[in-house]
Structure formats: structure tokens, C-alpha cells
């Protein structure tokens, strides 16, 4: 996506890596991955290394690229948005968000939008790139990638991650941004990526995300109350939660999916309104 911007001699593109003070492992041990669940969902930032940025500098556009962890912005992005540097950099600045995730990003984006509003930033576009192997297959493929470090650890598992062709095709977004940035010196106030397929909304996942987010909020508060990340009590609580989650997935989730399919005709108009809302500001 950034290639068209980098190739322009009349555009200065700066990169700011967000480095956790305590690096996250990859592959990620199973229980350690869940230990950060409460802080991630509750958006309690974990420390970053000092940010190598001049926060007094004014930018015409800021692109925030982040992953989704537990239906929430990843910890590094949460920490950045809580920093004094972000408060200075983003105030009054047009922002484009770029999401890379398995398939569910709506609730994470809602949380990030709220934080951007608090900082006085202006969200003008959103891009979401999701796993190519589909919702059902990625439910297995993505965790295996996370815990083994390999995108295709077994021959019978589809390759996890965003398709290379989709990543290459994202250059169209960079081209649209470059065209707008060089068109004039006026502030960017309107979406630049309308009609380019910046996001795709799967209406079947909207209700699931809302229910999942409410459940995550409840369990996060309970687990956080048990003790710090490395405490024995939190580990025991996490084992109970993971067992509960697995039971939920094999029982309630299939029944819920069937029920939603049967009731879909009754909520068609509402679903279309929700799709249009979550597709904003860029649209499908």
C-alpha cells in the first residue's frame, strides 16, 4: 500500500515502528497468549520503547496500521494511542486506519474510533485486509500459525494469513492517497478510497462480534481482578475461561448461527443499516 507513496518524490513518508518494552514472543506459547487477554480487551496499555518521532511535527496524513487481538486493537497500537506523542501527532490530523486480521475487526475499529475522537483526530478512511482461507478454516489455521510460527504447519491445513495477491492489490489505496495528497494543499476532509473496496462487511459476523465483545469485557474484568499477568490465580482463571470458551464454540455458536440464519429475513433492513455504518467512512 505504501509503495506508491514511497515512489513519489514530492511526498515524504515517515515510518514509526511500535516496539513493546517487553517483546511479545513468536511463536506465542498458548497460555502466555491468553495472559494478555484482559489488558488487551480493557485497553490497558503495556509499555512501549521510547517513540523515535518528533511529535511537534505536523503531518498532512497519518496511517495507523494495526492487528486485531481479542476483538480489540493490538496492545502496541493501544499503547501508542495512550501516549503523549499520539496526542500531539493526531490532534486535528486526518487518519487512515489499516487493519490486518483473521476476519473480525468491527469492534476493534469501534474502540479505535472512540480513541481517535478523544484525541481530536479525523478518521477519513479505513482499510481492512482479512485472511484468505475463510472464516471456518482460519479458525484453525490462524491459531496454528500463532502457536507454531508457520503459516501452513500441516498439509491438510490451509495457509493462514492475508493472500499475497490482496496485499499487492492494496497499492490501489496508496495510489489514491498519493493523488489526493498532491492535488492541492487543502486539508483532507473527505474519504479518498470510496469505490475501491477498502472493506468487506460479512453481515453474518456482526451479531457474533457484538456478543463476543460483551463476553470478552465481562471475562476480562473477572480475570484482571484475579491478579497480574504472571500470577498463578490468573493462570487458573484462564484455564477455566479457555474450557468455557471451547464449550461455547462447539455448542452455542453453531446453534446461534442456525438461529440467525432463520431470523435473517426479519432483520434484513436493520442488517443493511449496520453494514453501511460499519463500512464507513470508505465504504465497500
Can you name each region flagged by the protein language model?
Residues 1-65, 71-76, 82, 91, ...:
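N-terminal beta1-alpha1-beta2 submodule of the flavodoxin-like/Rossmannoid cofactor-binding fold
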Residues 25-30, 109-110, 135-140:
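Short aromatic-enriched loop/helix-cap "lid" or pocket-rim segments at secondary-structure transitions
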Residues 36-40, 114-122, 142-154:
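A polyampholytic, Gly/Pro-enriched intrinsically disordered region
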Residues 66, 99-102, 160-161:
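Second-shell loop/turn segments in exported
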Residues 75-84, 109-114:
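"Short basic amphipathic alpha-helical interaction patches in structured regions
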Residues 94-135:
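Short, glycine-/small-residue-rich phosphate/pyrophosphate-handling segment
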Residues 134-211:
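Glycine-rich phosphate/pyrophosphate-binding loop and the adjoining helix
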Amino acid at each position: 500500500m505504501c509503495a506508491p507513496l514511497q515512489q513519489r518524490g514530492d511526498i515524504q513518508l515517515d515510518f514509526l515502528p511500535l516496539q513493546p518494552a517487553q517483546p511479545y514472543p513468536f511463536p506465542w506459547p498458548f497460555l502466555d497468549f491468553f495472559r494478555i487477554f484482559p489488558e488487551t480487551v480493557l485497553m490497558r496499555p503495556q509499555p512501549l520503547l521510547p517513540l523515535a518521532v518528533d511529535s511537534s511535527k505536523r503531518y498532512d496524513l497519518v496511517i495507523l496500521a494495526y492487528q486485531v487481538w481479542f476483538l480489540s486493537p493490538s496492545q502496541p497500537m493501544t499503547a501508542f494511542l495512550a501516549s503523549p506523542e499520539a496526542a500531539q501527532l493526531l490532534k486535528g490530523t486526518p487518519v487512515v486506519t489499516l487493519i490486518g486480521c483473521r476476519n473480525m475487526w468491527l469492534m476493534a475499529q469501534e474502540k479505535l474510533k472512540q480513541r481517535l475522537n478523544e484525541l481530536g483526530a479525523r478518521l477519513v478512511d479505513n482499510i481492512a485486509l482479512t485472511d484468505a482461507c475463510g472464516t471456518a478454516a482460519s479458525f484453525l489455521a490462524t491459531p496454528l500459525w500463532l502457536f507454531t510460527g508457520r503459516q501452513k504447519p500441516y498439509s491438510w491445513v490451509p495457509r493462514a494469513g492475508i493472500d499475497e495477491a490482496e496485499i499487492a492489490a492494496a497499492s490501489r489505496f496508496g495510489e489514491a492517497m498519493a493523488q489526493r495528497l498532491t492535488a492541492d494543499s487543502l486539508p483532507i476532509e473527505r474519504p479518498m478510497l470510496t469505490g475501491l473496496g477498502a472493506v468487506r462487511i460479512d453481515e453474518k459476523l456482526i451479531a457474533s462480534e457484538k456478543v463476543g465483545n460483551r463476553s470478552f469485557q465481562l471475562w476480562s474484568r473477572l480475570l484482571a481482578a484475579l491478579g497480574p499477568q504472571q500470577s498463578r490465580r490468573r493462570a487458573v482463571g484462564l484455564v477455566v475461561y479457555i474450557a468455557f470458551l471451547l464449550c461455547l464454540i462447539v455448542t452455542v455458536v453453531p446453534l446461534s448461527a442456525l438461529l440467525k440464519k432463520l431470523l435473517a429475513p426479519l432483520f434484513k433492513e436493520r442488517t443493511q443499516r449496520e453494514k453501511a455504518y460499519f463500512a464507513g467512512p470508505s465504504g465497500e
